[in-house]
């Protein structure tokens, strides 16, 4: 079964996120558990936690259908010690917030070397950062998102994701989220079913489908292999509809949150309905 949704707003309170997801016909959702552009946030109160859990139950969302995203400020591979510690503290707080909310996944961008340290050193720092957070939390999996490779961001090659996982001590609590726009911009072709087969065969060989814990379904304004991160609505960009139809009809993508971060929230309900229809079309066939 496919869990399909979008990254919805938690404005006005975390408990509003499940309702907003339900309104667009989603069976999954992503959210920020705090302001993503600030380092610090007030601790979660028992009331906020209870309200969120009640809303999830009301709208039939289990933890397996929810893919929280951490702050954009965090860089777990930062080359400067003081800044690295600040990011690690913030990441631990994000993991603990998920733990308090009964969530089991935390999606994050791996990190950037900022042209100051070697790629290998940065990847090792990211893995160490994950180990530190996992040692102080329980039940939450750190879900590494592939990047487009813009600037000095790492995680744009499957080999880089595999290297981070290799450095994580508890393999049961590390996973990967594949963003289709990022993959395409990083040079992994998705424009035809044959290209999708090839790209995900490579993913399976290098990373492994056992680590796939979520996906971001985005078309791309950016060109193939451009290393530029620019999302687009499904079928409107340079990837096209075929990739998303192919994903919907492949059982390897069952049981994980498939999250839209496409650029027009006004048509998310339509995009979700279209994705669901592709799945039904395969079942009928």
Curated annotation (Swiss-Prot):
Q: Kindly list any coiled-coil regions of this protein.
A: none
Gene3D superfamilies, per the entry: Divalent-metal-dependent TIM barrel enzymes
Q: How is the cofactor bound?
A: Binds 3 Zn(2+) ions.
Q: SMART domains, per this entry?
A: AP2Ec
Q: Domain of life here? A: Bacteria
Residues binding Zn(2+) 3, per UniProt: 182, 229, 231
Q: Which reaction does it catalyse?
A: Endonucleolytic cleavage to 5'-phosphooligonucleotide end-products
The UniProt similarity line reads: Belongs to the AP endonuclease 2 family.
* Name this protein carries in UniProt: Probable endonuclease 4
Q: Which organism is it from?
A: Salmonella heidelberg (strain SL476)
């Amino acid at each position: 079964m496919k869990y399909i949704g979008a990254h919805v707003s938690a404005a006005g309170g975390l408990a509003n996120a499940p309702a907003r997801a339900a309104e667009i016909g989603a069976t999954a959702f992503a959210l920020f558990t705090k302001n993503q552009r600030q380092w610090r946030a007030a601790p979660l109160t028992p009331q906020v936690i209870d309200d969120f859990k009640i809303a999830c139950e009301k709208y039939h969302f289990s933890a397996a259908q929810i893919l929280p995203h951490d702050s954009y400020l965090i860089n777990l591979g930062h080359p400067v010690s003081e800044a690295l510690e600040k990011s690690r503290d913030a990441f631990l707080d994000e993991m603990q917030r998920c733990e308090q909310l009964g969530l089991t996944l935390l999606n994050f961008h791996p990190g950037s070397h900022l042209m100051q340290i070697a790629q290998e050193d940065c990847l090792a720092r990211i893995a160490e950062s994950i180990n530190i957070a996992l040692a102080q939390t329980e039940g939450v999996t750190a879900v590494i998102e592939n990047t487009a490779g813009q600037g000095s961001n790492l995680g744009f090659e499957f080999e880089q994701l595999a290297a981070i996982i290799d450095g994580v001590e508890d393999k049961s609590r590390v996973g990967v989220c594949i963003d289709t726009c990022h993959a395409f911009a990083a040079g992994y072709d998705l424009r035809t079913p044959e290209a999708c087969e090839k790209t995900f065969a490579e993913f399976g060989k290098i990373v492994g489908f056992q680590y796939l814990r979520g996906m971001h379904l985005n078309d791309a304004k950016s060109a193939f292999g451009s290393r530029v991160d620019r999302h687009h609505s499904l079928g409107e960009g340079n990837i096209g509809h075929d990739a998303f139809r192919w994903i919907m009809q492949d059982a390897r993508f069952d049981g994980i949150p498939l999250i839209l971060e496409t650029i027009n929230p006004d048509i998310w309900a339509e995009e979700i309905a279209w994705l669901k229809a592709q799945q039904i079309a395969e079942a009928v066939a």
